[in-house]
Amino acid sequence: IRDVAPSRGLGDVYKRQLQDYLKEIIDIADLHGVENCYVWANGDLISGNIHKSIAVSNRENVIEQIVGVSELISEFLSELSPHFKNIYFSSVAGNHSRLEEKDLASPHERLDDLVEWYLKARLQNFKNIAFDNYEKIDDTMYLVNIRGKDYLGVHGDYDGSASKVQSLQTMAQRPVYAILSGHLHHNKIDNVQGVKTVMAGSFLGMDDYCVGKRIYGSQQQLVCVCTYTGIKAYYDIDFDTSIYRPQRSDIAA
């Protein structure tokens, strides 16, 4: 899950996207006979004011965003729970949720971290939703074991080059099967130095900063089906948000 903060006043759009995503996940789970669901939120849940262009386009302040996105995800997890034996949630903060510009910001102080804290309290009565099933290496990465294989989760803002794969394995202090990331606003599956790299897209797609920097983004998420041998299948989940919004002919003059 990435970029669900209602930073453009589009909370209803994101809610409908999450509902569509939920249906896709359930259909895929039924097709493959899936037992457990691992939800990884790899950052940028909250849109802070890290760039002037983002600050201008944010229509909701960060407090409204934290409450709004936390409620969206808690509803999403609660609706997933009847369809799986266990739901495991893991997260790492993204660069969009930092409090200051990159050169001044601490990697240990990001607004995304408040979302998981909120979710734990909100969903404490759901016995099959777990938040402590992963190992936090530091505030920028975590490890989650799925069917005997270790998956390393990062946001990706520190890990853009192929050479970082070996560095991440060294920091994990164990062989890593796959690296899960986000950051670049589109889905991508690759294999680098024998390690799978799985990058998930963004509910938002492109923000004003992406447009200005000519950074490609697509409104999409990713579902992976994992077995004891690793990733058996993956699915691109694309969203056409034009179907969620009033068309020009539907808007009263």
PLM-predicted stretches and their roles:
Residues 15-125:
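Core catalytic region of metal-dependent phosphoesterases/phosphodiesterases
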Residues 87-95, 130-140:
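Acidic carboxylate-rich catalytic motifs and surrounding loops in phosphoryl-/glycosyl-chemistry enzymes
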Residues 10, 34-37, 176:
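Local beta-strand N-terminus motif with an aromatic residue
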Residues 142-144:
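Membrane-interfacial catalytic/cofactor-binding modules of polytopic membrane enzymes
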Residues 1-10, 14:
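Single conserved hydrophobic/aromatic residue that forms the stacking wall/gate
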Residues 2-3, 95-97, 155, 183-185:
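Histidine-centered active-site/metal-ligand motif
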Residues 9, 41, 92, 180, ...:
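Short glycine/serine/threonine-biased micro-segments
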Residues 109-113, 120-127, 133-138, 147-243, ...:
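Conserved beta-sheet core of the metallophosphoesterase superfamily
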